[in-house]
Structure formats: structure tokens, C-alpha cells
């Protein structure tokens, strides 16, 4: 990001700021806030500023998928980036993760938690369980959220939801744990606030029949709702929300009867609140309305038992309660029923989650997300705010312990060089509230509640006196009249003491439980399983005690996870978009400890791990720690040091402690992870490549077997084509985008390409023209290339759908002509890979149409030209046309003469062929059977077996007409055409298949290693047939073979090796290898050069490789060597190279 952009938009990560002060942090957050960049990082900690409106650009599916598989530094700050880091930790490292979201009420914590769930559901591939958590939100918000002065939809409970994952990283269920429900809100609300949403939803959304059945009225008529004089909320439609709640209840699988009973209990709580008491005399209470009331005795009297459980005689007394005690019992009953109802609803959600998760492979890994009410500071703060702020204080302590205190202590213990950072440790505040020795505020409060249980008046004052006496000089406590204040991490808060003791009692006596257990509402009875036979109850637990217990359980759950933090900031109290209250935000920056957090991040280390764990994860990045067997035998610390040194990381980026590796910068860790991803990716590619190679080779063998069965007994064969490897793509079609565009111009862009090469097509005048042939799974394409303004352009001349091909025709001789018969007009072309072309056409024809393609063999073939005229191809034997066919044209007839080839009965089936073979067979790898342009033992490649352990041996062949020495049998070899027994380097091989690859082979196999050569054959090898790529060199004539073990030197130079392979052990005359052992005996002197014949070019030809000649039609070329395989060595304008014999004619 440029300087101008930083000035306007701020930096993404506060660690990168040049100057670190609270003012600079606030200014950076403000810039980003007004640019709708609501997220900012402090290393791995995310700061989220509530925009009070939806920012669509941050919530699209495209935005979400930009973070998938990316590290945090690769994309702008976002909840998605943090969620991705948590998901990666679970999936890659099998470490439980948790996301702790903190901030004031209304700062956007719940929305942030929803985005975490949304992201995990989107990227994990199995979002059923996660979606269930999302669907539970309307239900849990209805029963657990309420309007407060700061937030219209404030969570009044803590929610810690876990998403469980199986070994594949897929969600397999989950669990929700609720903490600290603010049940006192059921019976009392501050003015301007509301009780839980469900009460108002039920009153507004119930049907007329339900309202009549449950005697529902306007909220003003219920004492539990009319205290705050707030019944509606701007932006909340209670009728619509009730419909959403009903739908969520159905999704969670609650029965209709369970739903009915739940809503009846909600209504019953409201009616219970309308029960009023008056003084009945002598300090006892009486029900104000004398209508029969089932709970009257339970509310007016408390049952006391004397004598104890072990006494011989026990007495029971009904002790009347005063008005305050009766009202307290009523409210305690209402709060308890509601609290247990909420717990039951959460349990139903968990049951639904478990059903979604199924009983599959659970790996016990999970991501937990904590969404809990934020720190609260109101004009009047009571017991509820005290409890909420205590929990937030504990969360802040947890944050400090992990990110500030523990980190610095670890550096000291590990002997890491470190500059200590000062910070405020709020442990002293936590001890003030929860301490036991000396007793903290909760302990003092419980003591007052136990000693003054029979009265309410004066309890709060007594409690306040005890606090003032217990903390007379505490730096974080200050007593006042009827109130006290605590200096929290978020600031000083004054709490009104009134109501503390009453709300802390939270007492429900056995007599009330016994009455409930007699209810006809079986659902309600199931929520109170207490054994009331033990009539002498122990001292009841208080709200404060339960709160501390729940908070300890929460801290324990978080401590088992690797934490991620989202620190939410509320920019204003008006809930307005683009409204920045500098004072409010600065205060939050202070109490969230962002300044200290930035300082620690800048001075500290972003990552640390035990030596064993670090080495286990990253050892494959160095051959010294990975090795052949993947094990490091030395000490783990030494292995880590070796690994980091081999990676070339500067020592300023990492340090080794006593038991751990410390990485200073996140970018360094990201670099390690990226290296690991690349390594895994490369390994995956190798495995895929090996598999595809095996499949491809197996497919080639099947095709060659098909071709052998098709041609055997029907057509004479060319020597070089018998064992030629099929390469399919001879013009590098995959990289030829202009040609691809040309093919797609027909409107078919999803066809799979099966074969590509250049062919010579006979036009309507019988003259050959070069075309690019492309065979796909659906059609055959012929394209013409020409130069235009120095650029090669393509023009699609014809597309023939495979289903419209009537038949194919070939002669019975060894020529390379193929005729495709079509109802419009036929296509006649020549190509030295005709067998491969016909095989592929037959295969794809049957796959597309389900029937066999007719193939005719005839030496008199009638075809229809593009102008509609009938033409005839007549084939006959002409032994003088051994180098290339002779062609004579008449008006409607073309006579083609060709020398005798291998007998029709020649079997070109792969050796040791079995239909299931291919794992290590014949002709695989680069430069397998006849790879490159080489014929058997001839110059550019010869016979060769496939790579990967294939066994190679040449096919027995009949003696050809041309006096070409036969190759010696190949032996098994490995790698890139390892040593093989090569025959004499006779000529330059016939047309072969592109680039020969590594393989086990004899002559011409792979990039042949040295091979044992036979006696040198005369002359330089003849050219291979036209085809792209280069085969690997083999035995005799392999590569430009180095000196080797050979027989006695033969005359002349051996044929060149296939492709441009490395040196091979050639016999005399093989490759360029010297004769004899070592460099062998001196070769025989070359005979006097005869007069060189000349030829005339019939067509233009562009060289395909560096050792070929480019020429134009009519050029005169001096011929130095003719090879019956079809390539002649010529010279033009002082440059020597190879020319295709069928492009020239003798002068």
C-alpha cells in the first residue's frame, strides 16, 4: 500500500504503524471506519468496529471465497480470515480452536460470531451441523436476548458453541453451552429496557385461539413487563420475530405438544408475576387476591424440618413468610422456571445437532466461538452489571495471561532475547471480586445473604458496610453512600448496592419444588428432578456462587483450545452509521489494551512450537531432515536448526529456546506454510502424474493392440511404425491458443482433444496442402495456417462430426494415405501416424455413437472431391519408391507406387500383452518403442521399453527390402533409458512419435544411457518420419553417443541418437561414439565421397527442429544421405539438415 493510500485509508495492521500511541491507533481506526474498512489487525488479533449498517462488499459470496485457503497476510483483515486460520488449525494440525469475541454491549459481537459460523459452513463442505447452529439463532435470541439501553438486541446470556469435525475436516455435529443467563430480567427491568423478547413475541404473535386459551393481554397488564414502561422497539417486528421463532422450533425437532407446553409456561410466568401479597398480620404475608391459587401455601409458608436426617425423631413445621419473603419466593420460582426452560431449549438444540452430526468418524476436534454480553457501564448499575462485568474481567485476565504475561514469562524461561513490556494486570481486580482469603465481594455478599435470610430491609446497607470495612485502602475499590465503585480494566463503574442481596439469594425452597413436581405439565415436571424426600436442605447456593462456578467452567473450556481474538468496538451510542465518537472509542481502545497488545506484537515472536512438533510439521522442507525414509535421527533441536538453516531464513527471524522454536514475524510463518503447501502440491502432482502416466500407457497399449488386430493380415506395415509410441499431440496443441480459438470458433468449446498433428490433404486438384488435423471426442477438424503480417493465423476449413463419418478407407500397402468418407465430400490425407489416427477415430466413434466405425482395405479407392467429382486412388508396388511414394496424376485418377513393406501378417501387438497390463509394460516413458523419429536401432531412437519398471524387447520382424541390419535384442533397463544392447546404428529412423521420454529400453529408448553396441553400421542414420518432439537416444546411435564399449570399428559414423539424448555406449559407428573399448580402436577411414545427388522441393516446408532444413517449393537441395525410413540429409545454402523425403523429388 502506497503512502498516499495509507494517509487516506490507514494501515491494515496496527503493528505496521510507524508511530504507536493511543491517539495514532484511534486515528487509524477512524480513517478505516469512514472508508467502510471496519476490520483491522494487530497481528492475529482482529479489531472490528460496528458500522451499524450492512456493508455489502464485505459479505458477498465472492468475498468469502477470497479467504478460502489463504493466510491472514494475503487478504485484507476480516472475520473470514480469522475463521480460516481457526479452520486450518483444526484441519491441518488437529488442535482445538476457539474464537473469543469481546467488547461492549452493542459493539457487534453476535454478528461477528454469525460470520464465523457462515464461513465455516461455506468452506468445510458439509455444512449441515453448522447450518443447524445458525437456524438455532432465532430461537435462542427470542429466549435469551432483550432490549437494553445500549442495544436493541442484546445477548443476556453467554453462548459458547462448538462445531465438531471429523478426520476429513468436515463438520459432524456440535454443541452449545449457555452461561450466565440474566434471569433476574424476568422479574425486573430498568426503565427503558424490556424483558426477554419471547414475552412480547407471544403477546403480539399468538393466534386469537391461543390468546384466549392462555389469557393473554397487552404487556401493560403484566407486572413483570410494565415496570420499565417499554413495550416496543424500533426496528423489531414482534409478530414477524414470533413466526421466525416458531419456524426455528420446528427445525429443532420439537413436537407440537412440547411447543404448546413451552408457550403455556411463558404465559404462566407472566400470570405468576401478577400474584400480589399484603401483610396478613404478625409479620406474615397473605395473597391479595383470594381467588383459589394452587401455589398459595408454597408461597406463604416455608417448610422447616428439625432433628436432621440421622435423628431418631424429626419434626416438620410450616413457617409463615413475610411479604418480602413471599414476593421473593414468587420471583425465585418465575426465574427458576424460565432459566430451566432456557436450559431445556438449549438441550433440544444440542440433540438436533447430534442427529445432524450422525455417528460417523468423530475426531474430537472442534472450533468454539464465545459470544457473551459485553462490558456494561450505565448511569445506574446494579447486580446484573456487576456479574456481567465480572465475567468480562475474567475474559480480560485470560487474554492478558495468554498474550501478555504468559508470553513474556515464556521468553524468560526459554532464554529468548526480549525487551519486557509494561502492562496492566487485572488479576488484582478479579481477586477483589472473587477472592476467598481475604474474602472478596462475592464472599461478603453470600455471607450477608446467609445470616440475614429472613429479612430484606437493611441487608444491602449491611453488605455495603462489610465491603467498606473489608477494603478500606484497596486501590481499585471505593465505598460511597448506598453505592460502591470498582476500577475495572474498562474503567471505573459505580454500582448501586440496592437489590444486591435480594438478587443474589436466588432461592427456591423444597416446598416450591414439591408443588411443581405435582403439576400436570409433564414437561415442567421434567425440569425439576430434585429429590424432595431429603427435606432438610443444605444452605442454598446463591447467584454469585453459581456465576463463579460457571465462569470457572468457561475458563477451563477455553484453556483447552488455541485462542483467536476479535475485539469489538462501538463507535457511538446513537447506533448511527459513520458517526465517530472520539472520546468513546479512545476509552475502548484503552481498556481493551490495544496499545500494549501492539507493543508486545512488535517486540515479540508471532509463533512458537515445541521442537518435536515443529520438526514433525516442517521436516519435509529439507532433504536433511526428510531424507528417504522421512525421519530425523538426531536431536529434535538440532533438526530444527538444520531445517531453518537449509531454508535460508535469516537468524533475526527466529530463535531456538530450551524446548521451543520461536518465529518472530508472521510473514516467516506464512512463508513456511506456503513452502509446505508447495511441497505437498508437488508430491500430489507427482503421484497424479505417475497415475496418469500409467493410465495413459495402459491406454496406449490397448490402442496398439486394437491397431495390431485391425491391420494384421490386411495391410503391409512400415518398419518404423510397428513399435512406435503413441503421443497423441504432435503440434503442442495445449499451448497453441490461436489454434484452440480456431477450433472453438465452431461453437464447441468443451470437446476433449484426442489427437493433433499436421497432415497433407489432397485438394480437389490432387495437390497436397498442409493442414492441422485435430481429432476430438466429437469431431474431426482440419485447419489451415498461414502468415499474416508476420503472425501465424488459423482458418478452420472443415469440421466433420464423428457420427457423420460413413467409413474409412486404406490401401493394403505400406503407404500413409487415409480416406474419410462423408456424405458431402471425402477427405484424403497423408500422415505417417495413420495407424494411430485410425485407431483413435475408431475408439471415439464407438464411444460417441455406440457402434463400430467401418474400415475398408482396398488398393482401388473411389472418393468424392470437394467439387463433387468422383476420383480414384490406385495403389501399386514400385520397389524403386522405397524412400517415398511415387505419384502419377491423370484427370480423375491418382496412381501411387510404394515399395514392399513388412508382411501383412506382421504382428505389432505389444509383447507379453494382457488386457489388465500397463503397470510396467512395453513402450512407456519417453522414447519408448520407436520413440522420437528413430527406427529400430536407427539414429533417433529405436526400440525401447517404458519407464517405471517396464520390460523392453523388440518385436520380431521380417527382413525388409532395404538392407538394414536388424537390432540386437534389448535388455531391461531403468530410468531415462538405461543401458541396453543396441544394434548397429543403421540410418536415421523412420517417422516416430514426438518426444521420447525416459524408459527402459534398448536402442532408441528414452534419453538413453550408455548401451553395449554391436558392430557399427555404415553411414549416418536416416531421418525419422515427420513429427513433433524428439525421442530419447538409445543404444547404437543413441544420443550423440559418447565413447563406449564396442566391437571393432565400422566404416563411417553411426546414426545420431533419438532426440537430443545424452551420451550412450555405442558400438563403432553408433551415435558419435568412438569404436572399441573405452574410446575403442580407431574407426576405419571413410570412403571417398561420391557425387552428391540433388532433389527439387515440391512443397514449402518449415523446420520443426533445429537440425531440419526449411525450404520453399522449387528449391534445389543437395542430398548427402538417403534413408528408406523417409528422412534425407540435405544441404541448402550451405546449411545441412534433415528433410522429409515426401516433400522432394529427384532431379
UniProtKB/Swiss-Prot annotation:
Residue numbers binding ATP: 103-110
Short name of any one Pfam family annotated for the protein: Myosin_TH1
CDD domains referenced in this protein's UniProt entry, alphabetically: MYSc_Myo1, SH3
Keywords: Actin-binding, ATP-binding, Motor protein, Myosin, Nucleotide-binding, Phosphoprotein, SH3 domain
UniProt KW Nucleotide-binding keyword: yes
Gene3D superfamilies on file: 1.10.10.820, 1.20.5.4820, 1.20.58.530, Kinesin motor domain, Myosin VI head, motor domain, U50 subdomain, SH3 Domains
Record carries keyword Phosphoprotein: yes
Domain called TH1: residue spans: 715-900
Region (Disordered): 901-954, 969-1089
SMART domains in UniProt: MYSc, SH3
PTM annotation (Phosphoserine): residues: 315
Ranges of compositional bias, category Gly residues: 916-951, 975-1079
Assembly behavior: Myosin I heavy chain is single-headed. Dimer of a heavy and a light chain. Inability to self-assemble into filaments.
Misc remark: This organism expresses at least three isoforms of myosin I heavy-chain, encoded by genes MIA, MIB, and MIC.
Notes concerning its domains: Myosin tail domain binds directly to anionic phospholipid membranes; myosins I could therefore move actin relative to membranes and vice versa. TH.2 and SH3 bind tightly to F-actin; this together with the nucleotide-sensitive site in the head, allows single molecules of myosin I to cross-link actin filaments.
Function: Myosin is a protein that binds to F-actin and has ATPase activity that is activated by F-actin.
Annotated family: Belongs to the TRAFAC class myosin-kinesin ATPase superfamily. Myosin family.
Protein's recorded name: Myosin heavy chain IB
Organism, scientific name: Acanthamoeba castellanii (Amoeba)
Gene name of the encoded protein: MIB
